Swiss-Prot record:
Repeat among keywords: yes
Protein name per its UniProtKB record: Protein IQ-DOMAIN 11
Residue numbers covered by motif Nuclear localization signal 1: 11-18
PROSITE patterns in UniProt: IQ (PS50096)
Matching SMART domains: IQ
Motif Nuclear localization signal 2: positions: 27-34
Family statement drawn from the similarity comment of this UniProt entry: Belongs to the IQD family.
Keywords of the record: Calmodulin-binding, Cytoplasm, Cytoskeleton, Nucleus, Repeat
Species in which this protein is naturally found: Arabidopsis thaliana
């Protein structure tokens, strides 16, 4: 079986090799003829027409590809001829060389194909990038142009508005708005025409027409009258504006004065109410003290509290400003001479009134008499009166000064040497208390 296969193969090679050799000869002749025709064609063809860059680029590309294909075909045909020649030699060395050469040719063909593909693709990418760049540049130019136009329009509008405002301000300053002169001239022309028509129709009392001079005089008088009217109107308008402005100013001043006056009246009314309240509390305290002094001497002490006195301290007076009732027996009531002596030696006493009404803002005698607060703070709750400089005894009730009825003064501590204490005390540093006490005793 192996021998039969060898015979068939030998026969096939014989017949196929002859056929292939004939075809290859014909093919070679055809390729050489093609090359000769292409070499002769440039001399025969006419000059090319004007074409675009893209078309010319594509044509050049096609020509290069066709030339490369023809060259590769020629090289392949030569290689095939050499291979067929080498097949006749049956040496293995030549066969190895032929195989290596074929592999080398195949690699070259692959490299050429790869380079063609790469060049074509790179050219395509470059053209695409160039188109994109051109589009971007155009778009940027368009957008920038629009932005510049828009900015220019806005600036022009702003400038126009600023110019209009400036013209209005200048017109208001000069009080000559634009177009007043024009209106004034037009009104004057219209008035002149009316006056001429009126004068043409006027006649004298005897139905005789007026002369030219008389007509001109009438027109002039009417013009003067119209000018006077306009001046009077302008004067009235300007004075009205000035009067309105003055009235506004006066109204604002009047409102301010009214507000101040109302505030002062409110404060005064509050002060008066406080004074009325304090004056109402006075007579109640005085009536209570008078009743205690006017009680009959023969009245039994059993009805009264047995020798009990309520001694109120300064802290209790401050906490409860109400009047304090003091009950004393009849046999302890002092006579008139004792009262006079005690008045001469006693000091002003705090009346049972609220301390709030005796503040600087509410006191009615703040401009007349001023007593120091140190007297109020240093004064004790008990007042001791010296009887002939021997025995000291607390007073049954606190004496009241007749001259200082409007003041609440704290009780004072009287020492054995009364002259030293009383000589030092004074009211507003005008008169000493001893002289004042003497005058009160004489009264």
């Amino acid at each position: 079986m192996a021998k039969k296969k060898g015979l068939f193969t030998v026969l096939k090679r014989i017949f196929i090799s002859e056929v292939n050799s004939e075809k290859k000869e014909k093919r070679r002749k055809w390729t050489f003829w093609k090359l000769r025709i292409k070499k002769r064609l440039p001399s025969i063809t006419a000059p090319p027409e004007h074409r675009t860059s893209h078309e010319s680029h594509e044509e050049q590309k096609e020509e290069i590809v066709s030339d490369v294909g023809e060259i590769s075909q020629v090289s392949c045909s030569r290689q095939l001829d050499s291979i067929e020649e080498s097949k006749g030699s049956t040496s293995p060395e030549t066969a190895d060389l032929v195989v290596q050469y074929q592999m080398f040719l195949n690699r070259q063909e692959e490299v050429l194909a790869a380079t063609r593909i790469q060049t074509a693709f790179r050219g395509h990418l470059a053209r695409k990038a160039l188109r994109a760049l051109k589009g971007i540049v155009k778009l940027q130019a368009y957008i920038r142009g629009r932005a510049v136009r828009r900015q220019a329009m806005t600036t022009l509008k702003c400038l126009q508005s600023v110019v209009n405002i400036q013209s209005q301000v200048c017109g208001k300053r000069t009080q000559i708005p634009g177009g007043v002169h024009r209106d004034y001239e037009e009104s004057n022309i219209f008035n002149d025409n009316i006056l001429k028509v009126d004068t043409n129709g006027q006649k004298r009392w005897d139905d005789s027409l007026l002369t030219k001079e008389e007509k001109e005089a009438v027109v002039m008088s009417k013009k003067e009258a119209s000018l006077r009217r306009e001046r009077i109107k302008e004067y009235a308008v300007t004075h009205r504006k000035s009067a309105e402005s003055y009235q506004k100013r006066s109204n604002t001043k009047w409102k301010y004065w009214l507000d101040e006056w109302v505030d002062t009246q409110l404060t005064k009314s509050k002060e008066l109410e406080d004074l009325d309240f304090s004056s109402k509390t006075k007579p109640k305290d005085e009536t209570l003290n008078e009743k205690q002094l006017k009680t009959p001497r023969n009245s039994s002490p059993r009805r009264l509290v047995n020798n009990h006195r309520r001694q109120v301290s300064i802290g209790e007076d401050e906490q409860s400003p109400a009047a304090v009732t003091i009950t004393t027996p009849t046999y302890m009531v002092a006579t008139e001479s004792a009262k006079a002596k005690s008045r001469s030696l006693s000091s002003p006493r705090i009346r049972p009134r609220s301390f709030d009404t005796q503040s600087e803002s509410y006191s009615p005698y703040k401009n007349k008499l001023c007593l120091t607060t140190s007297m109020m703070s240093e004064a004790p709750s008990k007042v001791r009166i010296a009887n002939n400089g021997s025995n000291t005894r607390p007073s049954a009730y606190q004496q009241r000064s007749p001259g200082l009825r409007g003041f609440n003064i704290g009780p004072l501590k009287s020492c054995n040497n009364n002259n030293t204490l009383l000589n030092d005390l004074s009211i507003n540093s005008e008169r000493s208390l001893p002289s004042w006490n003497k005058q009160s005793s004489l009264r």
